[in-house]
A protein has these predicted regions:
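Noncatalytic, basic helical substrate-engagement surface that gates or grips nucleic-acid strands
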Residues: 1-131, 138-160, 237-239, 245-253, ...
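Non-catalytic nucleic-acid-binding/docking modules located in mid-to-C-terminal regions
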Residues: 54-58, 102, 125-128, 146-149, ...
């Protein structure tokens, strides 16, 4: 079995930036260029490569607004603007990955999640490959399958989420994560869900009905105020499910052979680290 690692690049850079930004330790080199996100990013990439030893790697990035914003202008509207000191570090991250022999990829009108979803789908369809997704974003848990698992990053470690661990945690199949979001919403992405339905109620409903489609087909068997909330929020539930669903057909025009790990360009890498003043 050939192993592919699918890394959420935006997630890693944001995590690395805010890990020190909150404490006021932005880290800058002598030219006053911010380096804190890059420092954590490099350490994380090296850790992933050492632990996983993959043959195939892609680091996916967002590329501006995507098709979800066209359908729902308020998508992720509650998030603060990306700090300029973080934005400056993205191009250097791409250069570092290139020097490491790792493919970085962003596609117009799609999110990093969609790129990862596309490669996850490719792993599902090809018996020669399995894939591990690396991110702290629970949205990606919907991609878990027999051939795909998720290293769900925590503050100091991670949880390896596979089909069994997901079921033990939620009592559902991983794909039902989109139905869970359809009902309870997601404040971080500004996905509305059904007003008044929280995680506990949503899980109980899905344990009984499995999908929102089956739930609404059997809405008369739901009792009390929950039924009223569901009826009132039906349109929002279906819309939320659509927005929460990761798209798996991004036109990447690539196969796994195109993300095969290449030899590191040690000279280029050394020069980048020297410029950033990474000496350890």
């Amino acid at each position: 079995m050939k192993r592919a690692i699918l890394i959420d690049g935006n997630n890693l850079l944001f995590r690395s930036y805010y890990a020190t930004a909150y404490s006021g330790n932005l880290m800058k080199n002598s030219k006053d260029f911010p380096t804190n996100a890059l420092f954590g990013f490099v350490n994380m990439i090296n850790k992933i490569m050492n632990e996983e030893k993959p043959e195939y790697v892609v680091v996916a990035f967002d590329k501006g607004k995507n098709f979800r914003h066209e359908e729902y202008a308020e998508y992720k509207a509650g998030r603060i603007e990306t700090p300029k000191d973080l934005l400056k570090q993205f191009p250097i991250a791409y250069d570092i990955l290139d020097a490491m022999g790792i493919v970085s990829l962003g596609v117009d009108n799609y999110e990093a999640d969609d790129i990862i979803g596309t490669f996850a789908r490719m792993a599902d369809e090809d018996d020669m490959y399995d894939a591990t997704i690396v991110s702290s974003d629970k949205d990606l848990l919907q991609l878990i399958s027999h051939d795909v698992n998720v290293k769900l990053l925590k503050q100091k470690d991670y949880i390896l989420m596979n089909e069994q661990v997901f079921f033990d945690t939620y009592g559902l199949k991983p794909i039902r994560m989109i139905d869970l979001k359809a009902l309870m919403g997601d404040a971080s992405d500004n996905i509305p869900g059904v007003k008044g339905i929280g995680e506990k109620t949503a899980l109980n409903l899905l344990h009984e009905y499995d999908t929102i489609e089956n739930l609404y087909d059997n809405i008369d068997s739901v009792k009390g105020k929950t039924k009223d909330k569901l009826i009132e929020g039906k349109e929002s539930a279906y819309f939320s499910k659509k927005i929460a669903t990761i798209y798996k057909e991004v036109p990447v025009n690539m196969s796994f052979n195109d993300i095969k790990l290449k030899d590191r360009n040690l000279t280029k890498l050394k020069n980048i680290y020297k410029d950033l003043e990474f000496f350890s």
